[in-house]
């Protein structure tokens, strides 16, 4: 069963979908997985398959659109990382008010950029009982630098500086094609074309977002998740964020922590070929953190 819901974050109405297990009985309160989407995605891309799989295992799962994305209110396609963290924290509060949710057993599950967001939000919010970060990153500037040739990186830096001047003079940021910030890979085009979801991902992003991404460093706070358990999953052939980002996060995190690099697959194949492994590892983590359902 699925329920469409809305809640507010910073005065903006955000849209979400609640996935309920089939064996839910009146009065039941279940452990809940809050699922967080990637950079330019929305709640209808990739995550519904994971949410339904969690529900089949007896969990409640919730997927929502960050402000400015999907069906949520906010400046369209404007991504500010700390605002996304705030949306996650407010979603946690909202979930705790739902009759089907055990407010004391909420965990975070994030993919790609959402994998970075769940680390910083989980580190900030002690209500989070466990964090699963899938093909995320720890340092936005390092990611931006490593995904470009050096001259391209510095050219982007120069554009960002000019845009900062523009914003203080005009109050607006220049919007550019998302692929000028998020360098595309052949694996991405193949995955989304095959899934039929490519149209829903067409977007432009403000250069303000590029500046924000490059200043975002979840690895600076990842140690604060402990003593709650952390799961980091990377992909050996991840040419988008690079599995080294997961390794760096792992090195800076404290126990209890797990790191798994899935062999022979790309960033996007983590959601298809790697799906069963991601689910198995995540369910093991959540089961240990939350106890029997």
For the regions a language model picked out, list residue spans one by one.
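Catalytic nucleophile-loop/oxyanion-hole region of alpha/beta-hydrolase
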Residues: 42-46, 69-107, 271-274, 278
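Conserved alpha/beta-hydrolase
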Residues: 53-71
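Conserved alpha/beta-hydrolase "acid-adjacent" motif
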Residues: 239-245
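The serine-hydrolase catalytic nucleophile loop
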Residues: 39-52, 66
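Catalytic active-site module of serine/aspartate enzymes centered on a nucleophile-bearing elbow/loop
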Residues: 265-268, 272-293
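Short beta-strand/loop motif that positions the catalytic acidic residue
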Residues: 225-226, 232-234
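N-terminal cap/lid segment of alpha/beta-hydrolase-fold proteins
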Residues: 1-28
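Alpha/beta-hydrolase-fold enzymes
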Residues: 117-195
């Amino acid at each position: 069963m699925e329920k469409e819901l809305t809640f507010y974050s910073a005065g903006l109405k955000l849209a979400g979908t609640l996935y309920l297990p089939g064996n839910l009985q009146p009065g039941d309160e279940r452990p809940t997985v809050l699922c967080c989407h990637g950079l330019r995605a929305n709640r209808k891309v990739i995550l519904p398959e994971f949410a339904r799989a969690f529900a089949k295992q007896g969990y409640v799962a919730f997927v929502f659109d960050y402000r400015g994305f999907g069906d949520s209110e906010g400046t369209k396609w404007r991504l500010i990382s700390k605002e996304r963290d705030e949306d996650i924290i407010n979603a946690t509060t909202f979930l705790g008010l739902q009759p089907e949710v055990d407010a004391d057993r909420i965990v975070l599950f994030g993919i790609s950029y959402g994998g970075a967001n769940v680390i910083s939000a989980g580190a900030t919010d002690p209500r989070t009982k466990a964090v699963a970060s899938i093909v995320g990153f720890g340092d936005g500037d390092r990611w931006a630098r490593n995904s470009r040739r050096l001259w391209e990186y510095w050219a982007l830096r120069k554009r960002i500086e000019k845009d900062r001047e523009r914003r203080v003079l005009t109050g607006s940021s220049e919007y550019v094609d998302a692929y000028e910030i998020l360098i595309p890979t052949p694996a991405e085009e193949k995955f989304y074309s095959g899934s039929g979801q490519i149209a829903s991902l067409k977007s432009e992003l403000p250069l303000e977002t590029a500046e924000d991404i490059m200043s975002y460093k979840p690895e600076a706070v990842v140690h604060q998740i402990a003593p709650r358990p952390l799961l980091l999953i990377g992909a050996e052939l991840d040419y988008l964020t690079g599995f080294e980002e997961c390794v760096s996060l792992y090195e800076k995190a404290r126990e209890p922590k797990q790191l798994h690099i899935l062999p022979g697959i790309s960033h996007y194949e983590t959601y298809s070929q790697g799906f069963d492994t991601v689910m198995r590892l995540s369910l093991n983590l959540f089961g240990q953190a939350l106890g029997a359902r």
